[in-house]
């Protein structure tokens, strides 16, 4: 990953490459740009907003983990706060393809896990597939979300997904990224369980009521959280493990460094993530211990 990031930086225009390099290679870089940092990049580059976001896509794509397709896709989400979040696609050799995370899903979940309550626009290398269009239609900002592709004018999500099916069709009026706290608690004092419980309490699961969260502990001691992102069309739903793995990937972590995992989910939900979580972790490393709590 580091080599790909270096290569991407070398492609950047000289007008803003030094400043961008300083940001991206900083030890505390978290694959986001503040509104102020992005404004400085705009000033230095002299580019229009859309053109700069497209120019930055190679940085996002450099985070991709795609051992199956070797097809590296980047995405950049702008939250309603003005901060920009990078994302990339993620694949798992040995796991069924349904465990794949698309770049759009990665960038959106990245923003969500860092506290964003909505997405203003998303910039991607290639036209979003139907799966991702449906995933984005779950968002709080689905009606106004704009999609920017290289060498094209921006379009709204609804132009890419006309006559769309979404939460409202199932009687749900709160979208993905809505502020929520399910208020679940546990007396279990295991740190990773408590962290997974934090993720569970912000999860989006209006259709199955399987509120769920995952926490991953790395060898470095860092902990990454993932909340379940359910979708009205069911199949585009993003499991909590994948959300947590995306957070780790966007911080430059290696999946080989996962030391332990925890899954907390509702005991009364209509589905369970336990079997799929176990299976995916088994593919990554069969020795990763998984703590489990059903509430």
UniProtKB/Swiss-Prot annotation:
**Is Hydrolase a UniProt keyword of this protein?**
yes
Key words of the record: Hydrolase, Metal-binding, Zinc
Name of a matching Pfam family: dCMP_cyt_deam_1
Q: Which GO terms describe its biological process?
A: cytidine deamination
The record's SUPFAM superfamilies line, in alphabetical order, gives: Cytidine deaminase-like (SSF53927)
Indicate what this protein is called per its UniProt record.
Cytidine deaminase
Q: Which cofactor does it need?
A: Zn(2+)
Q: Which GO terms describe its molecular function?
A: cytidine deaminase activity; identical protein binding; zinc ion binding
EC code: 3.5.4.5
Catalytic activity, as annotated: cytidine + H2O + H(+) = uridine + NH4(+); 2'-deoxycytidine + H2O + H(+) = 2'-deoxyuridine + NH4(+)
Q: Which GO terms describe its cellular component?
A: cytosol
Binding-site positions, Zn(2+): 102, 129, 132
CMP/dCMP-type deaminase domain: from which residue to which, for each copy? 48-168, 187-295
Q: What biological function has been recorded for the protein in this entry?
A: This enzyme scavenges exogenous and endogenous cytidine and 2'-deoxycytidine for UMP synthesis.
Question: What is the active site of this protein?
Answer: 104
Q: How does it assemble?
A: Homodimer.
Name the InterPro entries on file: APOBEC/CMP_deaminase_Zn-bd, CMP_dCMP_dom, Cyd/dCyd_deaminase_Zn-bd, Cyt/Deoxycyt_deaminase, Cyt_deam_dimer, Cytidine_deaminase-like, Cytidine_deaminase_bacteria
Per the entry, the cofactor note is:
Binds 1 zinc ion.
Originating species: Vibrio cholerae serotype O1 (strain ATCC 39315 / El Tor Inaba N16961)
Its family?
Belongs to the cytidine and deoxycytidylate deaminase family.
Where along the chain is substrate bound?
Answer: 89-91
Judged by the first EC level, this protein's enzyme class is hydrolase
């Amino acid at each position: 990953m580091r080599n790909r990031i270096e290569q991407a930086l070398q492609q950047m225009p000289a007008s803003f490459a030094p400043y961008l390099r300083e940001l991206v290679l900083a030890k505390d870089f978290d694959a986001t740009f503040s509104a102020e940092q992005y404004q400085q990049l705009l000033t230095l580059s002299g580019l229009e907003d859309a053109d700069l976001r497209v120019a930055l896509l190679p940085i996002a794509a450099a985070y991709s983990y795609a051992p199956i397709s070797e097809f590296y896709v980047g995405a950049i989400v702008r939250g309603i706060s003005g901060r920009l979040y990078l994302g990339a696609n993620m694949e798992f050799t040995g796991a069924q393809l349904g465990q794949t995370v698309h770049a759009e899903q990665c960038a959106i979940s990245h923003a969500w896990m860092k506290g964003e309550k909505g997405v203003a626009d998303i910039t991607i290398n290639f036209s979003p597939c139907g799966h991702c269009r449906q995933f984005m239609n779950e968002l709080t900002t689905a009606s106004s979300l704009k999609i920017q592709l290289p060498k094209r004018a921006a379009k709204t999500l609804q132009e890419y997904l006309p006559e769309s099916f979404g939460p409202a069709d199932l009687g749900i009026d709160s979208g993905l990224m809505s502020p929520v706290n399910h208020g679940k608690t546990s007396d279990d004092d295991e740190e990773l369980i408590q962290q997974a419980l934090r993720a569970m309490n912000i999860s989006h699961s209006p259709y199955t009521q399987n509120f769920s969260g995952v926490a991953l502990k790395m060898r470095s001691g860092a902990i990454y959280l993932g909340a379940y992102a359910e979708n009205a069309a069911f199949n585009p739903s993003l499991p909590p493990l994948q959300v947590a793995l995306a957070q780790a990937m966007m911080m430059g972590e290696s999946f080989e460094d996962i030391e332990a995992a925890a899954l907390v989910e509702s005991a009364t939900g209509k589905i369970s993530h336990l079997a799929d979580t176990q299976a995916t972790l088994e593919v990554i490393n069969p020795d990763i211990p998984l703590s489990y709590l059903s509430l």
